[in-house]
A protein has these predicted regions:
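Electropositive, gly/pro-rich neighborhoods at or near active sites that engage anionic ligands
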Residues: 2-163, 168
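An anion/phosphate-binding loop that grips the pyrophosphate of nucleotide cofactors and donors
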Residues: 208
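NAD(P)-binding Rossmann-fold cofactor-contacting core
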Residues: 175-189
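C-terminal functional extensions of proteins
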Residues: 222-261
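Residues at the starts of beta-strands that form the adenosine-phosphate
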Residues: 155, 176-177, 236
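A short SAM/SAH-binding and catalytic strip from SAM-dependent methyltransferases
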Residues: 215-218
Length: 261
């Protein structure tokens, strides 16, 4: 008989996060606590310009700056939440409208993700839902160098191209102890490490004790298979970034994002 976690992984994990999000709103409303009405307006703007998203970072190789992805921002009940995705667009409607949207494409999934991030932040349940800017990415890389040396792992895998974090991991551990996968940059070599195909990273889960996963996998729909592989190989998973802020709270994921706002 399948356990609760196994049953969840048979579903679309983002759909499960949405179900739990609705449950949080309902339970808080029934308890007389602060909640958000489903008729609350949601405005999703995107894509944000590079200046709006990152300010003036000290490096120019971020995927957003190279046109590999876009950053969308939702505002709900006075709070902002963001989501990286490959598909851009705009949305204006109610929270109920967002909950009724099918999760068929990356745009619709990103609207839901950004909206949950904004809503949960407005309720004070999560923080760090807005990407760091200017010197923030540099500080983030410095934090990663210190953090990874405290972790008990021989090899680490990074899913999703975040060049500052990749460089920090390699400088801390060495290129032989770091693996990287990415959908857009598969086959390239970054900082002496070959980028694996993001759709086929089984070798990473076999070899690495710790897997760092970008929250963007929620929007592109690859997160389900990645978590299944992690469970099969009994690997520790840590999600990083702002995109996964709400889902990490709702699903009990470990998350690392020290420098976001």
């Amino acid at each position: 008989m399948m356990g609760r976690r196994e049953r969840m992984e048979e579903l679309d994990i983002l759909a499960e996060a949405k179900r739990r999000f609705i449950s949080v709103l309902q339970s808080r409303r029934e308890a007389g606590g602060e909640s958000i009405d489903l008729e609350e307006e949601v405005i999703v703007s995107g894509p944000l310009s590079s200046r709006e998203a990152l300010g003036q970072p000290c490096r120019e190789d971020f995927p957003l700056l190279r046109g590999k992805e876009v950053l969308m921002q939702a505002v709900c009940s006075g709070a902002a939440g963001q989501a990286f995705t490959s598909d851009s667009g705009r949305f204006r409607g109610t929270l109920a409208d967002v909950m009724q949207m099918p999760l068929n494409g990356s745009f619709e999934r990103a609207v839901l993700i950004a909206t949950m991030n904004a809503s949960l932040r407005s309720l004070g349940l999560i923080e760090k839902t807005v990407h760091c800017k200017d010197e923030g990415p540099k500080r983030c890389a410095s934090c990663m160098s210190e953090w990874i040396e405290e972790q008990d792992c021989e090899r680490v895998g990074l899913i999703g191209m975040q060049p500052a974090l990749l460089e920090a991991l390699i400088q801390a551990l060495g290129p032989d102890k770091v693996m990287i996968s990415d959908l857009a940059e598969a086959g390239s070599v970054r900082f002496g490490v070959k980028v694996l195909d993001g759709m086929d990273c089984s070798e990473m889960f076999k070899s690495c004790q710790l897997i760092l996963i970008t929250g963007s996998t929620l929007a592109n729909g690859t997160v389900d298979d990645l978590l299944l592989k992690a469970r099969q190989h009994k690997r520790r998973v840590v999600f990083y970034g702002t995109t996964c802020a709400g889902a990490s709270f709702l699903l009990g994921w470990e998350r690392w994002c020290p420098c976001s706002d």
